């Protein structure tokens, strides 16, 4: 029984997240339904990062097992044909060893958070950015972000319903940059870690936003982390600005 690794891109706006639910549309359900329509088999997908409702992906990775040894380009093209018109694309398919696990074999995950920083409304990207109309200082945000790097208890930045056994995580990257293209002003937060807590990236983004408008200092952010003072964090940044951008394997 061959195991297939899929690289997947999707717009999270119409979905209630990755994970299959009984009555709501999800990315997992869409792909598994396409697999059944294509192969006649019932397969269960395992992904690298289970994204929440409204969160996007440009390089999600998942694996599944099928009884038949299909050509990988056939798997890719057949799934894409059966996924239309849903905003989900299979970018590639390859056969991998049975030992490969899209979730447990991952050594690093990468996310990007986008903030549209202007007063005029977002005409084209409203489902992919968090619009903050007041001025933000990206350099102040970056300085505050550096205080979150390393191995810490991230209790202040986890959802109340987070099911992780431990709040300890090692944040390897958290960079904040401003992108300017004419009148286009976007702040991009790029972050990497082996794993993240539920809502961790969005919670950090909301807190860094407060640093950007000078309501929190870098020292304040460090103190929030050290004390677990969740009430001092910024708002939970909306899901629409978050994108799963990649995953590393050994």
Curated annotation (Swiss-Prot):
It catalyses: uridine(38/39/40) in tRNA = pseudouridine(38/39/40) in tRNA. Its EC number is 5.4.99.12. Keywords: Isomerase, tRNA processing. Substrate binds at residue 111. InterPro entries: PsdUridine_synth_cat_dom_sf, PsdUridine_synth_TruA, PsdUridine_synth_TruA_a/b_dom, PsdUridine_synth_TruA_C, TruA/RsuA/RluB/E/F_N. The keyword tRNA processing applies. GO terms for molecular function: RNA binding; tRNA pseudouridine(38-40) synthase activity. Pfam families: PseudoU_synth_1 (PF01416). One of its GO terms (biological process) is tRNA pseudouridine synthesis. The active site is at residue 52. The keyword ATP-binding does not apply. NCBIfam families: hisT_truA. Homodimer. Belongs to the tRNA pseudouridine synthase TruA family. PANTHER family: PSEUDOURIDYLATE SYNTHASE, TRNA PSEUDOURIDINE SYNTHASE-LIKE 1. Formation of pseudouridine at positions 38, 39 and 40 in the anticodon stem and loop of transfer RNAs. This is tRNA pseudouridine synthase A.
């Amino acid at each position: 029984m061959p195991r297939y690794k899929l690289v997947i891109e999707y717009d999270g706006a119409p979905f209630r997240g990755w994970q299959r639910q009984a009555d709501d549309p999800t990315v997992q359900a869409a792909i598994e339904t396409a697999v059944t329509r294509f192969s006649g088999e019932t397969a269960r997908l395992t992904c690298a990062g289970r994204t929440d409702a409204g969160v996007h992906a440009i390089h999600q990775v998942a694996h599944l097992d099928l009884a038949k040894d299909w050509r990988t380009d056939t798997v890719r093209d057949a799934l894409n044909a059966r996924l239309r018109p849903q905003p989900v694309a299979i970018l590639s398919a390859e056969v991998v060893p049975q030992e490969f696990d899209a979730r447990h074999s991952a050594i690093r995950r990468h996310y990007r958070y986008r903030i549209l920083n202007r007063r005029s409304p977002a005409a084209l990207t409203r489902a992919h950015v968090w619009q903050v109309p007041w001025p933000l200082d990206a350099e102040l945000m970056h300085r505050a972000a550096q205080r979150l790097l390393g191995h810490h208890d991230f209790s202040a930045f986890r959802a109340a319903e987070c099911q992780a056994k431990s709040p300890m995580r090692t944040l390897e990257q958290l960079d904040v940059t401003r992108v300017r293209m004419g009148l286009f002003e976007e702040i991009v937060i790029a972050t990497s870690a082996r794993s993240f807590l539920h809502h961790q990236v969005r919670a950090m983004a909301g807190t860094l936003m407060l640093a950007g408008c000078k309501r929190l200092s870098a020292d304040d952010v460090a103190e929030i982390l050290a004390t677990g003072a969740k009430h001092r964090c910024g708002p939970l940044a909306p899901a629409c600005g978050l994108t799963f951008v990649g995953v590393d394997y050994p």
